[in-house]
From Swiss-Prot:
Any one of the GO BP annotations: dolichol-linked oligosaccharide biosynthetic process
GO cellular component, one term: endoplasmic reticulum
Annotated Pfam families: Glyco_tran_28_C
Role, per record: Involved in protein N-glycosylation. Essential for the second step of the dolichol-linked oligosaccharide pathway.
Subcellular location(s) per record: Endoplasmic reticulum
SUPFAM superfamilies in alphabetical order: UDP-Glycosyltransferase/glycogen phosphorylase (SSF53756)
Alphabetized InterPro entries for the sequence: Alg13-like (IPR039042), Glyco_trans_28_C (IPR007235)
PANTHER family named in the record: GLYCOSYL TRANSFERASE-RELATED, N-ACETYLGLUCOSAMINYLDIPHOSPHODOLICHOL N-ACETYLGLUCOSAMINYLTRANSFERASE
Enzyme category, top tier: transferase
Transport keyword on record: no
Protein name, UniProt field: UDP-N-acetylglucosamine transferase subunit ALG13
Reactions mediated catalytically: an N-acetyl-alpha-D-glucosaminyl-diphospho-di-trans,poly-cis-dolichol + UDP-N-acetyl-alpha-D-glucosamine = an N,N'-diacetylchitobiosyl-diphospho-di-trans,poly-cis-dolichol + UDP + H(+)
Predominant cellular place of this UniProt entry's protein: endoplasmic reticulum
Length: 200
């Protein structure tokens, strides 16, 4: 049996409540479900989740801030499990195995933190990545990184405000265009240090 199409949304350890709250809106959950997402995992960091009542009821969040439930857009009828055409939705504050979480995902929506981005881009085969810079940060370095990676064709970029517009091409078209990020060449660093120190 093939595993369910899984979308990971991650903000690392930062606060990005506008993104995490947005992807957990009933309208956005229904959109994802209509686009074929069968499992949504939202890693939301230190933020306080602001959820609408029907989503809060579905997720049954525990004292650690983790929760799981099944979302369905069946005219408000609740479902017991994903076999009834529901989308599994899981929320977690943090994970001890981010690489493993990425490895189990078919696509990732991420804040533009360099650690999160590089973890996704270094996976082979490439995993489609939609980067949402947190423009509320003072120096807006996330936008610079996201724009540079977009220009080189490694990621798609969206804002929280245009996420609905971008998510369909991201899930339907981008997977065939995702390309592998170049492997880190550790010997280059050694060569630069040797050259600076005058070693031959």
């Amino acid at each position: 049996m093939a595993h369910p199409f899984t979308l990971l949304v991650t903000v690392g350890s930062t606060l990005f409540p506008s993104l995490t709250s947005h992807v957990l809106l009933p309208t956005f959950l229904s959109l994802l479900q209509s686009l074929g997402v069968q499992r949504l995992v939202v890693q939301y960091g230190r933020a306080e989740l602001k959820l609408q009542d029907d989503v809060k009821q579905t997720l049954n969040i525990d004292s650690q801030g983790d929760g799981i439930g099944v979302w369905s857009d069946n005219d408000g009828d609740r479902v017991r499990d994903e076999k009834q055409n529901g989308m599994v939705v899981e929320v977690m504050r943090f994970t001890n195995d981010f690489e493993g979480l990425v490895g189990k995902s078919d696509a990732v929506i991420s804040h533009a933190g360099s650690g999160s981005i590089l973890t996704v881009l270094r996976r082979a085969p490439p995993i489609p990545l939609l980067v949402v810079p947190n423009r509320s940060l003072m120096d807006d370095h996330q936008s610079e990184l996201a724009d540079a990676l977009y220009k080189d064709g490694y990621v798609m970029v969206a804002s929280v405000e245009d996420l609905e517009e971008k998510v369909q091409p991201f899930l339907k078209i981008w997977p065939s265009q995702a390309k592998l990020f170049p492997e880190t060449r550790k010997e280059v660093f050694r060569e630069v240090v040797d050259d600076l120190m005058g070693y031959d």
